[in-house]
Amino acid sequence: MDLYNYNDLAAFGGAGNVADVLKAMEAGLQTGMQYNDQINNGGGLKVESLDAYIKVLANRLNQLVVYNEMPKQRIENTVHQYNQLYKYGEEIGIFNLEGETPEETDTQYIRKSIISKFMGVTGQVTDPAMLAKLAGGMNMYTREVQNKTTLLLTLIDTRLTDADSTCIAEQFDGIFRQHMMGVAATDRGSTEGMSTEQILDAYYGSQAVIDAQNGILTDALVEDAADRVVNVYNGYIDRIVSAPVVFNNYVKKFHESKRVVVGMSNSVVGATMGQSVNDIMTQFGKVAVKTDKFFDVRRPIKASATASSPKAPGIPVAGGTKSAVVADTKTNFVLHAGSYGYLVTAKNRYGESAPLKLTDTALAVAANQSVDLQFTAPVGGAYAPTCYVIYRTKKVTALTDTTEYYPIFTIPASMLAAGYDGAAATKVRDRNRIIAGTKSALIYYNDSQINEYLQFGDTRKLDFAITAPSRRFAILNYGTPCLYQPAKICRIINIGDEGLGA
């Protein structure tokens, strides 16, 4: 019901009175700007009230927890090298005869290197914008520098987890990629000569990875992760890092178990209810709960999504058999048999293409099956793809226009021809290693011996030459995350929402 629905009500005393009432009500809603070039009886004299402070709808810098709290080191070249102590020596016989010289054994080291990458965004403020009086006396140029700095650091914090130089060469290797390669190398001695399937098998079967199987985070998972870090890989723990929804679901599990004692002071009247967990106590010490809303971000898309950039690649082309189930002894669909939908997009450093539907109807997958997907590179286009992103729905009964597809993994374009994760040539296999719509968590000790952000160039502003009535500038950051001891970090994967309310 709005004011115009009262036009024919007799209570207003006829159409003339109604028109006068409406005129008065409308006048109160108009501003001086709306009276421009009109003869009026004073409404144009109104002066608008403008709040002097900008209400920031986006995130703030203090929400970038992983980037802010990761130890920083200034490096002096784009390539940084370091040594890992692999083994104190061989396990030799230590007992000797009286006066006998003990057996000799050498310490073993591994020489490693990592390359700094170059990140930045450009901003511009016109000369009129810098001359105009703005809310709160704000300097528009200063404000725009702050905005672009926050934007760049937010994007870096987001990419700290999922960046992969094998998919986009200009990216650094993020935490998940370094963790995968480091854990596989620690467990197997080296990843040299290993296929993608062998590396994935080694990683997801490692003691440094725990699969929650779409369940919520529990004390048992945290305890197991702490045990793996301390007793398997000789590490320490002081924190667990994940997305807010993971800890939100974690505390919900305890809400229904709260007991209210009637009659006890502050139990009912004036009580504080709910659950807030700042630390989780394990057998091996206390771990602080660290929440980062940009940690392990996997945003869903719909089949109708469009390209994210004019420089994004074209849409992939469907193969002979877009999707088909295959029997597989390595599948992780054992507990997740059901029907699913698939999409694929092509991606480069500029953006992502519109998706190609690989399933026209929901595809039924049994507990002993995996899914093979087939597609080829886009035809034509000025910007070629460097990788492909595979999307899958959660378990569904039918696919509709509103169905959401979640990114589950990304493959380099160079790996498509040979087949991915055990699939035949030109095909990609989904073994449900990552469950759609889930998150990860990391448990580790945040120390410069474990991880650092190596800064070849700290975040700074570079002004461009003035060639027009505007000021242009770039906010730059040169650096890369580095996991020195990746196996001393335990990753809990596939944290979902099953188990809530149980």
Where do the language-model regions lie?
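Disordered, low-complexity "stalk" and linker segments at domain junctions of extracellular
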Residues: 301-439
